[in-house]
Amino acid sequence: MPVGKVTMLPLHKEFNGIRKTIFTDVDYLAPRLRVEDKREILDSVGLNPYQALANGYNSSEICLTIIDTKDIPVGMFGVGETGIIWLLATPEIHRIRFSFLRESRKVVNLLNHKYKILWNFVDCRNELHLRWLKWCGFKFLRKINYGVNQKPFFEFIKLYV
């Protein structure tokens, strides 16, 4: 575990299919990410999937892995110290989409208690991420050309009230 990593918020049994990330999840997920997610990380920060996942793991105070019914990783998401939230997934996330949506909304609400502002930028073309963010209660602030490739992204936010 990286130095300075904050103690994980307690994940109760009720959060089925989401567990604390271990670094081997990065190795497993990197070559399997969705095309849309690969494009989003390349256009925003110019990293390859392995670099993006490793960076997310190392820079996030809280990092979680989404697993299927056989405990196989299908995605990762996390939050950095300033409330920057992110999600990267494989195409297999569609197989567990209903349970993931139900559980991730609970986890995002729990995260929002710790981080009063959750925010980031999302590629306007990444429909799965846009739907997930809306489902979890995020609001879209503005559309701007963003990142190393200056592609259209939405800035999004969720405030704890």
Name these PLM-found stretches.
Residues 65, 70-86:
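Conserved beta-strand in the GNAT
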Residues 86-102:
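A short, internal acetyl-CoA/4′-phosphopantetheine-binding micro-motif in the GNAT/acyltransferase core
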Residues 118-134, 139, 145-150:
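Conserved beta-strand-loop-alpha-helix junction that forms the acyl-donor binding cleft
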Residues 5-31:
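A short beta-loop-alpha structural element at the N-terminal edge
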Residues 146-161:
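C-terminal "cap" of GNAT-fold acetyltransferases
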Residues 53-65, 116, 151:
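A short helix-loop-beta-strand connector motif used in the catalytic cores of GNAT acetyltransferases and
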Residues 103-118, 136:
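Conserved acyl-CoA
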Residues 35-53:
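Conserved GNAT-fold acetyl-CoA-binding loop/helix
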